Amino acid sequence: MTNNDKEKQPLLSSINNEDDNGATINIVEPVPWYSNIPQKIKNSMSKETITILIYVVLYVTSGVINSVLLKKVMNKFTNYAFFLSQLTNFGYVPIFGAVTAYKIFFTKDIPQETRDFPTRKFAIMGALDAITGFFVVIGGVSTSGPLQQLLNQAIIPFTMIASFIFLKERYSLIQLGGALVIIGGVVTSLIPSLLGGSSGGNKPFWNFFYLLSVIPGALSNVYKDIGFQAVADMDVWYLQYWDSLYQSIFGLFLFPVNNWLPPPATVKFEQILPFMKEGAECLAGINSIIPSYINGTSSFTATSCTYAPDATITCDDCHNAWIVIILYMTINIIYNIFILLVLKHAGATVYSIANTLRLPLTNIVFSIHFIMGSAVSPFSGLSVAGLVIILVGLGGYRVGSMIKQKKAAAAGGAIKVIPSYGPAGMDNIIPVQKEYIEPKSQAHLRNQFFGKLGINVPEARYRAANNNNYGDA
């Protein structure tokens, strides 16, 4: 074989998958870069990560369903908003009471120290939540679902103001800027209602009435920080039982306000018993306010009700009302359970991101006709602008909060969450990461006093004295 043949042989043999000695050569095909992405994702998905993703997806899904069902319940009880407010308050009392009784008598989940916690603090929290729920339900009847979601975000700047006044809380420029943008988004979202061109049955008076709910809601958030400061771990079912009980009691005393409210919330003092009776009939699916016709013709009388969303007197639509209210209360409990699960397993940062994502998804669902029916709220230019502005503000506020939380964590802080279902329709405020200072027990203070007198007390006794309980909060 000539030299030229030898030089050509490797090339020819490689084409035939053979080397110089006749052995077979395996040619490795190049692998596309994107083919390994699914495997990389699978390898990075630990059991804990999958669990967190499931909790987040279920939280967002249940949150969207919860908001939609709340508006559907309001539409069913348009003429009986106060009855609905009390129904949602008293309806949770036996549920939370049964779970609390079981945990007290058959488990050790609720220790004596928790049961000794002053109930007056629950009463104050319940009173504030009752006022919030009153504004939410009464005003929500004539406030469209998308606008409700946007107005709810105003609780963030109002909570910041209340925290600054009562807790001397300080906020970063990023948080303040985000709050101002949120306010701008709320104002933008109210413009269509003020100009009279809004859809979904929005009425300016009731829109502002609904917006007022963020004031007692913000005060409730701040009081939870003050009243439960010394509580290391409050059982959520025990807290909700007392909160719903006092919320129901104080809610009854708000009835006189309806005497001076315009329709459809007007209920005179002498009409309270017939009103509650008709509300109960509506719950059972019986319509009391129905169209009246002129001498059997198809023409309505001047005082007849209509089914138009912007009507002064709206006809009852109580069909299957009891089914809708049961679904709402069930989903509401499930939704709040997932809030706690996301906070526990994923943390406040993931919860904040999921909560922000839930806002546009909910408003999209409100615009789908086959879900909302006649209560559908199509997007308008200003409603989209308000949504985008609020999302930008929420993003800025969340980023500022995350930075603040990281600084608090570096300084030894910890996320302290006061779980609360709160009134219907009002979102929980995002937990703030702050340093938790455990209060000193009486025995610890006594040993400390002896130490100042020159009496030597071993360090172990300090620790033992302070680990007994959280003291009389």
Curated annotation (Swiss-Prot):
GO terms for molecular function: xenobiotic transmembrane transporter activity. The chain crosses the membrane at residues 50-70, 81-101, 122-142, 147-167, 176-196, 208-228, 249-269, 323-343, 353-373, 375-395. Residues 71-80, 143-146, 197-207, 270-322, 374 are vacuolar. It comes from the Eukaryota. It holds the Pfam family CRT-like. GO terms for cellular component: vacuolar membrane; vesicle membrane. It is found in: Vacuole membrane. InterPro entries: CRT-like, Transprt_Chloroquine. Its main location: membrane. It is a multi-pass membrane protein. Keywords: Amino-acid transport, Glycoprotein, Membrane, Transmembrane, Transmembrane helix, Transport, Vacuole. GO terms for biological process: amino acid transport. Residues 1-49, 102-121, 168-175, 229-248, 344-352, 396-473 are cytoplasmic. Glycans are attached at residue 295. Belongs to the CRT-like transporter family. Nutrient transporter. Involved in maintaining the osmotic homeostasis of the digestive vacuole. This is Crt homolog 1. It comes from Dictyostelium discoideum. The gene is crtp1.
